[in-house]
């Protein structure tokens, strides 16, 4: 619909049911709606063929529930426009083993979208943002107010449009958006303790290989935006113990025995 400049019409709601303005199948779950569509087509003699097939669907990694992708407003950090800088940062770090740098490089080179840092969860670090109830303009907390939870603390003031009512941001930060700040947090802690020597880049980061694309990558991104060329001089990448060949130990799978 974007290519054709058509307005977005939401069919599936966040609760997994069909929107009220969709004829015939409103209020049904996605699975029930599929069955009802087939029934209606068959009833009107419009169904040419129906057969079972096997195909790939997206599922939740732990419980296996089918996942439906729903477009929504989210917060992003720009990474697509700084790919060259991120590649240079990766080259400036010593990787152990050296082959692991290839994973980082391949991830950066093949990025197709920016970093989504917002999540619809209960627990997490809140965004200090309120939206004008009339025009939707975001209003940010002053640095002196931080930390602040907009769900608990109302915004005082008026929007440029004259409205004085505001809606708090309910999303929270992705866990990588905070864990990627470890060098900055350590530096600030050291400064608070009176340590004046250069603290970043730190000496070494140790981590497992499967989070090169997350923890290592996002820490390098944050370090770039916080005016540090690299977060650490060396990064040591390790593996992890498998429950059986090709399967990692997982609490949800109960295979840790």
Regions found by a protein language model. Name each.
Residues 9-10, 16, 107-114, 118-257:
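Conserved active-site neighborhood of enzyme catalytic/cofactor-binding cores
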Residues 2-135, 215, 247, 257:
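Residue patterns forming the tRNA-binding/recognition surfaces of aminoacyl-tRNA synthetases
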């Amino acid at each position: 619909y974007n290519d054709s400049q058509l307005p977005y019409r939401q069919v599936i709601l966040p609760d997994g049911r069909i929107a009220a303005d969709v004829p015939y199948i409103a209020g049904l779950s996605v699975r029930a709606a599929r069955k009802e569509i087939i029934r209606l087509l068959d009833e009107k003699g419009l169904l040419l063929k129906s057969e079972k097939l096997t195909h790939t669907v997206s599922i939740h990694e732990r419980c296996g529930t089918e996942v439906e992708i729903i477009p929504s407003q989210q917060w992003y950090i720009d990474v697509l426009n700084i790919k060259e800088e991120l590649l240079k940062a990766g080259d400036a770090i010593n990787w152990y083993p050296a082959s692991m740098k290839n994973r980082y490089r391949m991830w950066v080179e093949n990025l197709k979208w920016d970093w989504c840092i917002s999540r619809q969860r209960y627990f997490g670090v809140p965004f200090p943002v309120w939206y004008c109830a009339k025009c939707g303009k975001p209003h940010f907390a002053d640095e002196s107010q931080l930390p602040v939870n907009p769900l608990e603390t109302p915004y005082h003031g008026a929007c440029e449009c004259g409205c004085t009512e505001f809606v708090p941001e309910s999303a929270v930060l992705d866990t990588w958006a905070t864990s990627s700040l470890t060098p900055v947090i350590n530096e600030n802690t050291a400064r608070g303790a009176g340590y004046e020597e250069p603290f970043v880049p730190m000496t070494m980061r140790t981590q497992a290989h499967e989070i090169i694309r997350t923890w290592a990558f996002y820490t390098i991104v944050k370090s770039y935006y916080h005016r540090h060329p690299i977060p650490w001089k060396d990064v040591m990448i390790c593996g992890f113990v498998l429950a059986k060949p090709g399967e990692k130990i997982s609490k949800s799978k109960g295979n840790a025995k």
